[in-house]
Amino acid sequence: MRIELATEPGDPQHPNEDYASVALPASGQGGVLVLLDGVTPPPYEVGCTHPVPWYTARLGGAMLELSGSFRDMTLPEALSAAISRTAEVHRSTCDLSHARTPQATAVAARWSPDTVEYLVLSDSVLLVEHHDGTVRPVLDTRLDELPPAVKALRETVRGLPRGSAERAAAAREYTAAVEALRNAEGGFFTAAADPAVAARAVTGSLPRAEVRSLTALSDGASRWVEVFREGSWADCAAVVHKEGPQGLVDRVRALEAADPDGTAFPRGKSRDDATVVLVAP
């Protein structure tokens, strides 16, 4: 079995908001991977005293334990229970009803001798490589399917000079429009304090015999495909296999450095936390 992971903050001066871990049972039969991408908080009060890395560490740890130790639980059930457990830790001190209480995107996979199960919530990615070499991305595309009016606001922001007052004003309008769709019908979903959100995840299972490898990516790593258009998902998986997870992160960093202002490749952050997990069970 091959297990490798790499994670790197977008800004060395700020904590990494991603979480990644892999657990193997003592029996050696099967395993679990969990990757979370913490949602960077806005620059205003969100009703919680805890930083995003605090949240992702606790949610990720709970998800890893529950999905690995209780194999009778489905992955959505494990995520739901992990969200509930994490919420209880700070319910008495924080306003968990706030729309921007700490939250994260999620990828999880669990394998046994017979089956590979998977879960994806929001814009992190799981790549499933089959033995014939084909690679299938498991994607939750709801964040890409925003209403046309919201997409138009995003393009307006990207078309204005960075640092300008006009861009800042347009960005505030765009952000407000996106926030109105967060964890709402017709919008997109992230793991925050509502355990019911787990049922919104993209899930499925495959025969273990069909799966050669699994690669989980936070969106800071998947931008190699989605933002910089350096290759297909199959190309991305090939880079990870050949150069390791750190190799993909290094490639992304080089692309970001070549376009620091996002002129050629518009994106929300010039650099983002980037995490890659490779498992070849």
Each model region followed by its residue ranges:
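PP2C/PPM-type serine/threonine phosphatase catalytic domain
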Residues: 1-281
